[in-house]
Amino acid sequence: MDSSSVLWENWQTQVKELLEGIHGHQKKTLAFFVLGMVLAGSAVLQRVAEVLQERGISEAKMTSIERRLARFLANERIVVPQVWKLFLAQVLSYFRGKKLYFVLDLTPFQDELSIVYIGLLVHSRVLPVAWAVMPAKTKWEEGQWQIVGRLLDQITVHLPETSCTLIADRGLAGMPLVELCQARQWHYLLRLCQEHTCRRYFQGKLEKSWKRFGQIVLKPGYRWYGQARVWQEDTLETYVSLVWDKGCEEPWLLISDQGAGRRQVQEYAWRMRVEATFQDSKSRGWNIEASWIEQAAHLDRLLLALFLAIWWTSHLAAACIHHGQRQRFDRVDRRDKSIFRLGRLWLLDILRRAHHRASLRCCLPFQHTKTGWRFALRF
């Protein structure tokens, strides 16, 4: 049995069923691209083409495969929001009614572009759910908060009656973001800068004067949890958690509408997982910056394929850990392998050992149930 070809057949069928309404050739090329990324561990077209040809998934020349992938990125008929909306409609239904946490971040791509990104926290993984590619040096056609609001709406429509909390770092925290969350009945957990101001409540009484957080949190070991008013110009009544743990370079100055305490600090720490996701996307993992893409629309289509690949490798890595196989690929005394690398290595190992088709069907990231599609973190 040619395990790679069987996996390709199974994956192609799943994408076809998952994205009903999208042109058949577009779905096939997208599935082809995603599988190549997962097997290659790279988003660089040349490397993806090499692996697809080496494994017999395509009999075309490597250069022909590379041109096919490049045409996909340049194809204006592939409307990324339309494809992704269909995807979210299928997979987010599984998460309805649960308590969910999302991370908002902004990351540069080379020197010319920026990616506004929202990811769903699932255990130790951040799964991409919404993004926008914007110019880094020229004026945006939309305002920053219009973009964030649009991305939130792309998610909210699929999650009725669901508790959603948005986590964001200092560069994005402010009253506009709080208002976007409140308008959608989302909770917020934001980190503020030391220059931001507040008036705290002590035993029910409000401080008389405004103070910068930098005037309050002066040294490691300081902790304060309670209610306060923040931002002198656009004042907000909220809960504040001020923590400067020993051994840390900076304090965490957090606001939340769900209380103040160590719980909020622990929840904010989950945001760090998005850093690992972007490290995986860049030089230490998928290496998207080596793709030399300069046009926003081309990067948008590359991210469409890449983010599907991230969902897939997250599923594979979780299954590897669940089955107690992590030590086969990683050190026991410390964790050197990222989720991306662990998931890919586990898939390659399965392909080497596979003797029947059923074992390869389990590798796919989504399961079709009576109630719809379900994202499986393990198999």
Locate each region found by the language model.
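Low-complexity, highly charged intrinsically disordered N-terminal segments
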Residues: M37-L73
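Active-site-proximal, Lys/Arg-enriched surface segment
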Residues: M62, E66-R125, A130
